[in-house]
């Protein structure tokens, strides 16, 4: 399970260093192979390949009225291999789709990651905190 936030920088070629705390798990779980695609909230999703295959199968089974979401998730998906230095290349198309500049935030979200432009993530997080807890969390105990 992946968790935690990491402040990272994309290099001039659009490569991102995977934090060392995740590298071993990605090597073991997916042989360093990941898939990156778009997320409806404006960030990117980064899946270890076995988790992507599960997600892809679920998306593929969506009904016809969700065809555009199939296009968004599957049509934008790119398979990437982690290089020897533990970096993954985020394609120019996906960087544009995710609004990624140089500074990014990688969030561990359990079985996958979200990749955000750092400023966008901070703004959205602050807005969510200002709104208060949603009803679904009202009975949640810390």
UniProtKB/Swiss-Prot annotation:
Parts of the chain that traverse the membrane: none
UniProt keyword annotations, A-Z: Cytoplasm, DNA-binding, Repeat, Transcription, Transcription regulation
Pfam families associated with the record: MraZ
CDD domains for this protein: MraZ_C (cd16321), MraZ_N (cd16320)
Principal subcellular localization: cytoplasm
GO MF annotation terms: DNA-binding transcription factor activity; transcription cis-regulatory region binding
Domain SpoVT-AbrB: 5-51, 77-120
GO biological process, one term: negative regulation of DNA-templated transcription initiation
InterPro entries cross-referenced by the UniProt entry: MraZ (IPR003444), MraZ_C (IPR035644), MraZ_dom (IPR020603), MraZ_N (IPR035642), MraZ_sf (IPR038619), SpoVT-AbrB_dom (IPR007159), SpoVT-AbrB_sf (IPR037914)
One Gene Ontology cellular component annotation held by this UniProt entry: cytoplasm
SUPFAM superfamilies: AbrB/MazE/MraZ-like
Keyword set includes Acyltransferase: no
Subcellular location: Cytoplasm, Nucleoid
Family in the record: Belongs to the MraZ family.
Subunit note: Forms oligomers.
Classification via PANTHER family: TRANSCRIPTIONAL REGULATOR MRAZ
Name of this chain's protein: Transcriptional regulator MraZ
Source organism (scientific name): Paraburkholderia xenovorans (strain LB400)
């Amino acid at each position: 399970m992946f968790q935690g936030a990491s402040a990272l920088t994309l290099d001039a070629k659009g490569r991102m260093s995977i934090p060392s705390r995740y590298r071993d798990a990605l090597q073991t779980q997916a042989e360093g192979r990941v898939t990156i695609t778009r997320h409806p909230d404006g960030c990117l999703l980064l899946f270890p390949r076995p988790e992507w295959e599960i997600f892809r199968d679920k998306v593929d089974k969506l009904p016809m009225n969700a065809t555009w979401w199939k296009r968004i998730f599957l049509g934008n998906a790119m398979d990437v291999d982690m290089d020897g230095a533990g970096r993954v290349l985020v394609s120019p198309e996906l960087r544009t789709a995710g609004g990624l500049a140089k500074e990014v935030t990688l969030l561990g979200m359990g079985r996958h990651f979200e990749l955000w432009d750092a400023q966008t993530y901070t703004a959205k997080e602050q807005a969510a905190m200002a709104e208060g807890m949603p009803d679904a969390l009202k009975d949640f105990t810390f």
